[in-house]
Amino acid sequence: MRDKIKKKLNELRENSLFRVMPEISEGAGKYISVEINKGFGKTEVRKYINMASNNYLGLSEIQEIKRASADAVLELGTTSGASRIVTGNYNLYDELERVTAEFKQTEASLVFNSGYAANVAVFSALADRNTAVFSDKLNHASIIDGILLSGAKHIRYRHNDIDDLAALLEKHKDEKDKIIATDTIFSMDGDVCRLRAIVELAEAYGAMTIVDEAHASGIFGRGRGYAHEAGLEKRVDIHMGTFSKAFGSFGAYVAADRDIIDYLRNKGRSFIYSTSLPPAVVAANLAALKYVKNHHDIGYRLLDAADDIRRQLQVMGFDTGDSVTQIIPVILGTNERVLMAKEFLMEKGIYVGAIRPPTVPVNTARLRMTVRLDVLDETERILDAFRTLKAAGI
């Protein structure tokens, strides 16, 4: 077994796929601090403009949100102490779920420890070997893992290909229980799903629709998500979203009708068998949610800025795929090239993610740039760095 592990690790290194943790001292804010090894036992801490974090609205630095989190620690301590169904529940949790359901305009909601835990619970609880789940090929790994754990028939349709989805639904039309699952914003491409067509097919074939709004929550639809932006929120059965991205905190929610939420509370293993979130996190989630409700225009400001940056990158000759959101891929192709580009941009003071297979398909390695509301005053510096990258021919 150890020889097998060593062989696999060597293969990762040879293919520029070996991953290590960056020496980051602070990584959520406007600037990211990274410890650089200078050799001979010497290190240097450098500061970069943070274009890699999912803290899209910069809410982690909003004083009223930080104060709410700190107050909860002082009042309730640092841990919940148990799972929700034992003693890990408290009033802040109940308020967060009530406010979340009101915000999402659903009957009820349930808070989970992470988006991964939420998707694993949803699919493993609702689907079984008699269920057919139709899933976009670029859906997040948590959706895929939830489907696999459920034992359901996992039927993947080509990314955003409605004709392929329709053909597969027709082929499997006799399946009694059917689910269509999709991200609304795809995390590595920054494009959006064809939700109206998906909903119409789901209704025609009697399928349940589940959407993952992780990268749309807080931004689209006055912060409510892409389904609300498209005016389809009442035609979607289950909405999942996170507090760990635009809301600047941690954890996730599922919003749906009361029966579905009651069922997940009783059958969602990742919910039942996890210690609940600590008071500091729940209070931050609640404060962030209220902040977005009161500042619902900030998502549109972010999208307008991202649109301007994307158009300028395209003018330079960069391939940004089908992005129409705050996530902008710069597709370079090979693993080696994308790693070189990342290092080049770091020399210019810009930190972006270098995304390689298996996260993205082979030969589509890319820089993943996430536009953030709190870095817009640095836009020209960012664009100048990309102009220099293009001129360098990397």
Question: PLM features: residue spans?
Answer:
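Conserved N-terminal alpha-helix of the aminotransferase class I/II PLP-enzyme fold
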Residues: K66-S114, A306
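Conserved PLP-binding catalytic core of the aspartate aminotransferase-like
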Residues: Y300-D307, Q314-G349, N363-T364, V371-L373
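Active-site C-terminal subdomain of aminotransferase-like
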Residues: Y205-M208, H215, I219-V324
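Conserved PLP-anchoring active-site segment centered on the Schiff-base-forming lysine
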Residues: V122-A141
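N-terminal "arm"/small-domain region of PLP-dependent enzymes with the aminotransferase-like
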Residues: R2, K6, R13-L76, A207
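PLP-dependent enzyme catalytic core of the Aspartate aminotransferase-like
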Residues: Q63, R67-D71, E75, R98, ...
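Active-site phosphate-binding strand-loop segment of PLP-dependent enzymes
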Residues: N55, I155, H159-V211
